[in-house]
C-alpha cells in the first residue's frame, strides 16, 4: 500500500467535517474532535476542516497538489445526524468532489485517497455500501480518540 511507504517529505492532507464532539469525549471543547487523528498520523499532516453546508471550495482543492496522501473523514454518528439530518449526503458530496479532483489532476493521480467513515448505528452498512466507489474505505464505530488512533494503526500497520 502506497500509504505505508510515503517518504518523510510527503504531507498527508486530512479533510475533516465540522461536527459536534462525540458525547463521550474527554477533549476540551475548544479542540477539534479530529485533532487526535491528525496527531496520530505518522507523517506531517495538513488538517483542513470542511463545512457540511459549503462543500468543497477552491481552498480545499488548492491543498491537493502538494499532498502525498489524502484522508477524508465522513462522520455519520447518531449525534451528528441529530444535529444535521443531511450530514451524510453533504459529506459524501464533499468526499466525491475531492476524489474527482485527485483523479482529474495529473500531478496527484497516484496519490492515495482514503475515506474514513465513522458511524454508530444500524444504518452503518448502508453508509459503507453507498461509499463503495472509493478505492479505500475504513470504517470505525465512533470518533473518540481511541477509535481514531486505532484507525491509524489499521492504515499504517503500526
Model-derived regions, located:
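C-terminal non-catalytic regions of proteins with extracellular/luminal or membrane-system context
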Residues: 1-158
